[in-house]
């Protein structure tokens, strides 16, 4: 009977060993799979870090490029108007040189008036810069600054009788009010 018990115990031990071996193999397989998964995840993390750093560098380069473009835009925004100003300066220089040769001040005055009209015309057409403040205009406190006031008979509305300095507006925004003398009714 002892042999039977030993045999039975031996079979149990073998079965137990087989179970343990299977369990160990499963565990080892799980560990190998886990190690593979960890390696894959670490590789993915590394790739994502690289991608993040590249995108961050690209964004920084884009930001710097945008800043440089903005600086250049601001720097050269007035280039077109400066080209026009240079042409006006050329015309003024010609008028000055002409006046040195000839003492005809009437022609000089005519030439300078032509230059002023050319400047105003180009600024009006190209840049929407307009001059205002003429004798006889109705006084408008948002566009005119009254430097002095005189009383006058028979006026319905205050009007400009003398202009000390012209006003200018750019795209309908007042750059400078006209400085004027205003006449108003005695009432």
From Swiss-Prot:
GO biological process: protein folding
Gene3D superfamilies on file: 3.90.20.20, Head domain of nucleotide exchange factor GrpE
Annotated localization: Cytoplasm
Record Pfam families: GrpE
Location of region: Disordered: 1-30
Protein name (database record): Protein GrpE
Subunit text: Homodimer.
Annotated GO MF terms: adenyl-nucleotide exchange factor activity; protein homodimerization activity; protein-folding chaperone binding; unfolded protein binding
GO CC aspect terms: cytosol
Role this protein plays: Participates actively in the response to hyperosmotic and heat shock by preventing the aggregation of stress-denatured proteins, in association with DnaK and GrpE. It is the nucleotide exchange factor for DnaK and may function as a thermosensor. Unfolded proteins bind initially to DnaJ; upon interaction with the DnaJ-bound protein, DnaK hydrolyzes its bound ATP, resulting in the formation of a stable complex. GrpE releases ADP from DnaK; ATP binding to DnaK triggers the release of the substrate protein, thus completing the reaction cycle.
Highest rank taxon of the organism: Bacteria
CDD domains for this protein: GrpE
Keywords from the named record: Chaperone, Cytoplasm, Stress response
InterPro entries: GrpE, GrpE_coiled_coil, GrpE_head
Family, per entry: Belongs to the GrpE family.
Disulphides: none
């Amino acid at each position: 009977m002892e042999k039977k018990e030993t045999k039975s115990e031996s079979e149990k031990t073998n079965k137990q060993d087989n179970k343990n071996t299977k369990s160990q193999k499963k565990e080892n397989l799980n560990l190998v799979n886990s190690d593979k998964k960890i390696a894959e995840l670490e590789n993915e993390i590394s790739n994502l870090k690289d991608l993040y750093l590249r995108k961050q560098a690209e964004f920084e380069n884009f930001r710097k490029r945008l800043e440089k473009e903005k600086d250049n835009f601001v720097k050269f925004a007035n280039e077109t108007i400066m080209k026009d100003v240079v042409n006006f300066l050329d015309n003024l220089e010609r008028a000055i040189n002409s006046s040195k040769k000839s003492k005809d001040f009437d022609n000089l005055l005519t030439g300078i008036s032509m230059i002023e009209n050319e400047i105003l015309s180009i600024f009006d057409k190209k840049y929407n810069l307009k001059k205002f403040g003429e004798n006889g205009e109705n006084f408008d406190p948002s566009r005119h600054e009254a430097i002095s006031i005189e009383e006058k008979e028979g006026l319905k509305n205050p009007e400009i009788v003398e202009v000390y300095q012209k006003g200018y507006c750019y795209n309908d925004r007042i750059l400078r009010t006209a400085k004027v003398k205003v006449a108003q009714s005695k009432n």
